[in-house]
Amino acid sequence: MAIHLYKTSTPSTRNGAVDSQAKSNTRNTRKNLIYGQHRCGKGRNARGIITARHRGGGHKRLYRKIDFRRNEKDIYGRIVTIEYDPNRNAYICLIHYGDGEKRYILHPRGAIIGDTIISGTEVPIKMGNALPLTDMPLGTAIHNIEITLGKGGQLARAAGAVAKLIAKEGKSATLKLPSGEVRLISKNCSATVGQVGNTGVNQKSLGRAGSKCWLGKRPVVRGVVMNPVDHPHGGGEGRAPIGRKKPATPWGYPALGRRSRKRNKYSDNLILRRRSK
């Protein structure tokens, strides 16, 4: 990923650092892979109540249908384009398969236009290839990992994400996920070899508030400047302290270090080591 810095003429460009490779493709667009989506609610539930704060507005988006299942088995595909996707931080690749099928997949790091990929059971351990965990050697870097067999990849799909296969025993494989969590997954589940591209996404700087508004992100207001009815930190005369021993969330729970995972989940016995916060 190449970071582009503007010539300093305004504060917006002086503080901004954008991706010079993020370009949309219009020439080879497949209409059957792109469709509109009605983004209703903007952080509201069915009753219109805010359930996810700081969301709203933003530019209209077209959804790209991504092939997370990689179920074109034993058919070679060629990378035709590498495109920007407004719905995720990672880039996507348009793949032309030998049987005429065309699909989008996540862009593996290092993949270029013209490379070939394949998915199946006995395929080479090569970047971009998809195969079951049971056919991979220990230490393989993987992404787009299935949790349920046949459902498609659900883990390690963000830009720069990579997991590691560290053990195989019985019917399960042990993975170290990008969060640091170590958990068990069925060896029959599939994953893609390599790391997700666009690893330098954290180096980007939007530079101004308007750029964040385009992404559908609204301003974040500190609780200490709110009224007591709106936040536990609110109220007081002038610049007053929060009036508590420890910071709290808008709903009164401890703000620092509180575990937010739901209790008694089915996967508790599959997690060998909890993720590090």
Swiss-Prot record:
Return the HAMAP family for the record: Ribosomal_uL2_B
Principal localization? plastid
Q: What PROSITE patterns does this protein map onto?
A: RIBOSOMAL_L2
Task: Indicate yes or no for the key word Plastid.
Answer: yes
Pfam (any one) = Ribosomal_L2
Please describe the quaternary structure of this protein: Part of the 50S ribosomal subunit.
Which Gene Ontology molecular-function terms are recorded?
rRNA binding; structural constituent of ribosome; transferase activity
GO terms in the biological process aspect are: translation
Q: Region Disordered: which residues?
A: 1-31, 227-277
Q: Which domain of life is it from?
A: Eukaryota
The cross-references to SUPFAM superfamilies, in alphabetical order and at most eight, read: Nucleic acid-binding proteins (SSF50249), Translation proteins SH3-like domain (SSF50104)
Show the InterPro entries listed in the entry: NA-bd_OB-fold (IPR012340), Rib_uL2_dom2 (IPR014722), Ribosomal_uL2 (IPR002171), Ribosomal_uL2_bac/org-type (IPR005880), Ribosomal_uL2_C (IPR022669), Ribosomal_uL2_CS (IPR022671), Ribosomal_uL2_dom3 (IPR014726), Ribosomal_uL2_RNA-bd_dom (IPR022666)
Q: Which family does it belong to?
A: Belongs to the universal ribosomal protein uL2 family.
Q: Which gene encodes it?
A: rpl2-A
Q: What is a single cellular component term in the Gene Ontology annotation?
A: chloroplast
Which source organism does the UniProt entry give?
Manihot esculenta (Cassava)
Location in the cell: Plastid, Chloroplast
| Protein's UniProt name | Large ribosomal subunit protein uL2cz/uL2cy
Q: Which UniProt keywords apply?
A: Chloroplast, Plastid, Ribonucleoprotein, Ribosomal protein
